[in-house]
């Protein structure tokens, strides 16, 4: 290991940021255990690991959000501490988050110089402001109108503004947290061109992505994390299968325990569903006992389709039929009454009432349906909540505990439990295991198995292709708001899915549609 | 979290009491204040004075119970003072100028409150106006209508309304009304689907909506309820004076908000209790009463009350931090 590491870095400059055997625990949970990372100028270090592997904790330690419990941080070879983000910034460490830290109503120039606005007699010196902002943008060679409102720019342009802002603060180390997640193919190319330029200028970069091909394209080395442990540091062009094996650490069969029950009658039928700017001509069928995966890139319209089936958003035309009954559409409570349960993509913002108890969260969908004369069935709701919490093995101190105390996996099990209580037999899952650790993932897959064994139907949106390949019986791939094709789960590879997923993205018409989808998302 | 449970079980009686005091800061403050006032002046703890405090706190408490519904849903209602005046004035108008029977005019007053609240609720839920703006508008409109109806002068109110301000068999009706309003508020919040839905909406509106709760309808009902409570408070005020005053209840919305917040609710929504609100309202009345007895000028009273609001909320912030 030591020898290979020396070989890996023999021509590399000395690291400017080092994490030396750092550890971090939250309560009894050891999130990061003795991980060492070297960040070198002019190099791109890719961090690879599953959700919950500890990547985000690690970058939060680099940017001063978290302090390590053990080990030390070295900047320019000198041991130091990063007690807050200000200190990290003063060392030239900047993070570009997925959610950008920009003020949408201010101009590009003002955003680049935010917090350091040049003044003259206490007034904004607009001449200097524009000159300095332009200099920052020139560093990355991107042509953006300085006077444009940031909110009017596309997400890719906004990212460039954010990078320029970081560089203008003399950032030497850029941490890019999944920067490509919201970008189209062409925008990714542009971002990578900027990354290459910054490499030449000697900027050190830490790059996080779930896409192995991107890591191979842009990374120099890749560090693999698993369950908070450092596994290996390898050249970025290492064989993908090898990287996956290191990242997952076990065979796929164990990780996705899909049991295939007997397939019955169609439970959910969607016919020619259209919603302008969101998706076009969606038809699909999910039968009793079946898990259908809905794959595709971010912005392909998967979430929008699921929301429309669940009655959250209205559609322009088309039919949703549940167990032979046609729904009026655009009515959440109608969908629930007919057996639809919707697990939204953002658990904290859309799934849970974080300040309320586990019990109240479990009983949210059945609050009205179990009531008598407008009065809550308190003992019944409590009894049923206790039963379902036991059945789904939700780990908690008590049903009265605030749900915010629970781990991500147990929170998600509670959202499942809500629909178990409601007797839903058509489950719409949107990224059901996002932010859930590996162990709890398997438990959630077992819940999915139980639902289908009882004759339920599951439509599952997931950006994690291994999950789709491992848990779905059939896979529908969306691209540019349409269903681009259907694949059987058996014998399909990630590449097959990706080929369909990008099939409509590269022509400019759908790219516009994708941008529109982004916009409608923001409007909500 | 499991360790917290263990330590709670192990904890001594003393730390249990400490824990309870931390969680019931407003009540502890109220008791401490009462003890202090009793030591300062024996006149404080006499039956007539206590009844006096009860009557003085009744109006604000009734308004504050209605405000509790609104604040639990993460909203705000700035119109309750004006709606109180409007409900009372309409009632008096229909009695004195139209000549309808007294008990009907009482119902009219409550209905006007419901209507005003529902209009606020509709413009918030369906018109997508921020609650602050919608109820600020209603505050101005309701006050304006009150002045138009009354031409700026008091109007005598119906005997049925005046009964709300009297004392029967030694029981002052304002206190009875306050108790009734409080029990209904507690019942709605803790036992009914409507009440539990309010907590869900205030805690996370999107999660509530995706779980099938009729969020918009509930919001309209919440503001309508606050309107009814406001009108009831206005009628009680009117009953005590036997006439509806055009300037009644000016600034009361702020007292009501203060009572709810002192009672432990967060303006961010999802929390709040009828018992807390009652304690908040009584605390405000005790402070005013105590300072009056001690001959402190009413100018100073405002300063003290401002400090108490800041203290109560600051205390809550600390409590939430330590519990994390």
Curated annotation (Swiss-Prot), chain A:
ATP binds at residues 49-56. It catalyses: D-ribose(out) + ATP + H2O = D-ribose(in) + ADP + phosphate + H(+). GO terms for molecular function: ABC-type D-ribose transporter activity; ATP binding; ATP hydrolysis activity. It is a peripheral membrane protein. It is an enzyme of class 7 (translocase). Keywords: ATP-binding, Cell membrane, Membrane, Nucleotide-binding, Repeat, Sugar transport, Translocase, Transport. It comes from the Bacteria. Its EC number is 7.5.2.7. It is found in: Cell membrane. SUPFAM superfamilies: P-loop containing nucleoside triphosphate hydrolases (SSF52540). GO terms for cellular component: plasma membrane. Part of the ABC transporter complex RbsABC involved in ribose import. Responsible for energy coupling to the transport system. The complex is composed of an ATP-binding protein (RbsA), two transmembrane proteins (RbsC) and a solute-binding protein (RbsB). This is Ribose import ATP-binding protein RbsA. It comes from Corynebacterium glutamicum (strain ATCC 13032 / DSM 20300 / JCM 1318 / BCRC 11384 / CCUG 27702 / LMG 3730 / NBRC 12168 / NCIMB 10025 / NRRL B-2784 / 534).
């Amino acid at each position: 290991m030591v020898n290979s590491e020396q070989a890996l870095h023999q021509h590399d400059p000395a690291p400017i940021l080092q994490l030396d055997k750092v550890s971090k625990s939250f309560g009894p949970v050891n999130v990061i255990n003795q991980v060492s990372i070297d960040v070198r100028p002019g190099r791109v270090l890719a961090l690879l690991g599953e959700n919950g592997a500890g990547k985000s904790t690690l970058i939060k330690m680099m940017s001063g959000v978290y302090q390590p419990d053990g080990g030390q941080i070295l900047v320019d070879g000198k041991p130091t501490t990063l007690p807050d983000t200000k200190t990290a910034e003063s060392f030239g460490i900047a993070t570009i988050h997925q959610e950008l830290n920009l003020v949408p109503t201010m101009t590009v120039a003002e955003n680049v110089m935010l917090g350091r606005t040049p003044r003259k007699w206490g007034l904004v010196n607009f001449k200097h402001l524009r000159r300095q902002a332009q200099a920052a943008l020139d560093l990355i060679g991107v042509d953006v109108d300085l006077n444009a409102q940031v909110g009017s720019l596309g997400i890719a342009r906004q990212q460039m503004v954010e990078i320029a802002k970081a560089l203008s603060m003399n950032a030497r180390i850029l941490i890019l947290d999944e920067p490509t997640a919201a970008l189209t193919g062409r925008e990714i190319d542009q971002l990578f061109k900027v990354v290459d330029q910054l490499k030449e200028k000697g900027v050190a970069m830490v790059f996080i992505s779930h896409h192995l091909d991107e890591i191979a394209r842009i990374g120099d080395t890749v560090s693999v994390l698993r369950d908070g442990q450092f596994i290996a540091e390898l050249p970025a062009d290492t064989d993908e299968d090898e990287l996956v094996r290191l990242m997952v650490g076990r065979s796929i069969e164990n990780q996705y325990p899909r049991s295939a029950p007997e397939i019955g009658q169609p439970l959910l039928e969607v016919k020619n569903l259209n919603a302008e700017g969101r998706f076009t001509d969606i038809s699909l069928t999910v039968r009793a006992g079946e898990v259908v995966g809905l794959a595709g890139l971010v912005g392909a319209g998967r979430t929008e389709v699921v929301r429309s089936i669940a009655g959250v958003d209205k559609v322009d035309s088309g039919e949703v039929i549940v167990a032979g009954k046609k729904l009026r559409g655009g009515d959440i409570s109608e969908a629930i009454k007919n057996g639809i349960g919707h697990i939204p993509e953002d658990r904290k913002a859309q799934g849970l009432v974080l300040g309320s108890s586990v019990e109240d969260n479990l009983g949210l969908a059945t609050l009205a349906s179990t009531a008598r004369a407008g009065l809550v069935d308190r003992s019944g709701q409590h009894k049923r909540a206790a039963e379902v919490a036991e059945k789904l093995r939700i780990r908690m101190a008590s049903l009265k505990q605030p749900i915010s105390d629970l781990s991500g996996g147990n929170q998600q099990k509670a959202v499942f439990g809500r629909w178990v209580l409601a007797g839903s037999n058509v489950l719409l899952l949107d990224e059901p295991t996002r932010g859930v650790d590996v162990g709890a993932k398997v438990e959630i897959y077992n819940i999915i198995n139980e639902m289908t064994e009882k004759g339920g139907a599951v439509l599952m949106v997931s950006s994690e292709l291994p999950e789709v390949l491992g848990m779905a019986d059939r896979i529908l791939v969306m691209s540019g708001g349409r269903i681009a094709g259907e694949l059987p789960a058996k014998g399909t590879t990630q590449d097959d899915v990706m080929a369909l997923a990008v099939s409509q993205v590269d022509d400019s018409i759908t790219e516009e549609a994708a941008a529109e989808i982004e916009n409608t998302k923001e409007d909500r | 979290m499991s360790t917290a449970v263990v330590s709670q079980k192990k904890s001594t009686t003393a730390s249990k009491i400490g824990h309870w005091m931390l969680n019931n800061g407003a009540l502890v403050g109220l008791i401490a204040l009462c003890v202090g006032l009793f030591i300062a002046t024996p006149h404080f703890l006499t039956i007539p004075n206590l009844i006096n405090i009860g009557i003085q706190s009744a109006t604000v408490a009734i308004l504050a119970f209605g405000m509790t519904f609104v604040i639990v849903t993460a909203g705000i209602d700035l119109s309750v003072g004006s709606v109180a005046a409007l409900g009372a004035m309409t009632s008096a108008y229909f009695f004195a100028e139209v000549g309808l029977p007294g008990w009907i005019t009482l119902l009219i007053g409550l209905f006007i409150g419901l209507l005003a609240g529902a209009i606020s609720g509709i413009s918030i839920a369906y018109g997508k106006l921020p609650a602050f703006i919608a109820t600020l508008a209603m505050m101005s409109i309701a006050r304006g209508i009150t002045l138009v109806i009354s031409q700026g002068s008091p109007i005598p109110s119906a005997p049925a309304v005046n009964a709300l301000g009297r004392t029967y068999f030694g029981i002052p009706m304002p206190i009875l009304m306050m108790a009734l309003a409080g029990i209904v508020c507690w019942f709605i919040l803790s036992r009914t689907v409507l009440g539990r839905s309010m907590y869900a909406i205030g805690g996370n509106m999107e999660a509530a909506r995706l779980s099938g709760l009729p969020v918009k309808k509930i919001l309209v009902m919440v503001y309508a309820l606050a309107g009814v409570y406001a009108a009831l408070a206005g009628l009680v005020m009117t009953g005590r004076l036997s006439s509806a005053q055009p300037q009644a209840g000016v600034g009361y919305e702020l007292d009501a908000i203060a009572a709810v917040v002192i009672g432990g609710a967060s303006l961010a929504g999802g929390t709040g209790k009828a018992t807390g609100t009652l304690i908040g309202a009584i605390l405000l009345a005790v402070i005013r009463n105590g300072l009056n007895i001690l001959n402190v000028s009413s100018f100073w009273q405002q300063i003290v009350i401002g400090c108490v609001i800041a203290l109560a909320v600051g205390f809550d912030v600390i409590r939430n931090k330590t519990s994390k």
